[in-house]
Regions:
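Serine/threonine-biased, Pro/acidic-interspersed low-complexity stretches characteristic
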Residues: 4, 22-23
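Surface-exposed, polar/charged faces of alpha-helical domains
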Residues: 24-27, 31, 38, 42-60, ...
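Bacterial N-terminal signal peptides that target proteins for export
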Residues: 1-8
Length: 132
């Protein structure tokens, strides 16, 4: 079994390096951007069927998904620590924006507490991401 270990390690390493060098062509990138925008428009159209704060929450969710998808696309196009952090920040921001919108369903002290908790969670996530 030990005879296969170095060969396996070399094969895995070669596969990893080969896979990481596959960049998106400009046509693939453009098609992915178009797909992200089309998905966002479709999601937003679904949100328009809702009323009140439910519509606002739905729109924030759609924006968040779009922004996360864009950040992931950039990471796929040009993998880097900076782009990986941008993906994590987009996720944290989307979670925060939706949570803040959900707080609007509450009133008074409950709303204030909800907003403080959402902000604290967002700040902690940003701190963790930037600390990497």
């Amino acid at each position: 079994m030990n005879k296969f270990t170095p060969a396996l390690i070399l094969a895995l390493a070669a596969g990893t390096f080969a896979g990481s060098s596959l960049a998106l062509t400009s046509a693939e990138y453009s098609a992915a951007r178009d797909r992200i925008n089309a998905d966002y428009k479709a999601a937003k159209a679904q949100c328009d069927k809702l009323k009140g704060n439910a519509e606002d929450i739905c729109e924030e969710e759609a924006k968040g998904k779009r922004n996360i998808a864009r950040a992931e696309l950039e990471q796929q196009r040009e993998p880097s620590d900076k782009n990986a952090r941008a993906v994590e920040l987009a996720k944290a921001k989307a979670t925060y924006e939706v949570a803040e919108e959900r707080c609007d369903d509450l009133q008074g002290e409950a709303e204030d507490r909800c907003e403080r908790e959402a902000r604290a969670a967002y700040d902690a996530a940003v701190e963790r991401i930037r600390g990497k």
